[in-house]
Design a protein with these regions (language model features):
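C-terminal segment of classical bacterial N-terminal signal peptides
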Residues: 1-5
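Post-signal/leader-peptide non-cytosolic segments of secretory proteins
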Residues: 6-90
Length: 90
């Protein structure tokens, strides 16, 4: 019998993708991270998890700034870490 496949949670997958975007600025990575952030923040809204939603909106702003070559470096990574902690139940 085969072992069940282990999949990362949507939040963990988003965190990894967003971190790569913020560190390297590849347009395709950032675009996909924005799409995933939007889905997560809508999910947070639907669950009335407004603090989490607010944190995700901040990360979305950081991702857009990165796309515009105006990234905030370590501050953006810190925002991403805060969102990951604040949205842990998502």
């Amino acid at each position: 019998m085969a072992a069940p496949a282990v999949r990362a949670s949507p939040l963990a997958a988003f965190q990894a993708l967003a971190k790569r975007c913020l560190e390297h600025g590849h347009p395709q990575l950032c675009e996909q991270a924005l799409i995933e952030a939007e889905a997560l923040q809508r999910q947070a809204s639907a669950r009335s998890a407004y603090p989490c939603q607010t944190l995700l909106l901040g990360v979305q702003a950081d991702l857009v700034m990165q796309q515009l070559q105006a990234g905030r470096g370590a501050l953006a990574i810190s925002d991403l870490q805060a969102a990951t902690r604040g949205c842990s139940g998502l």
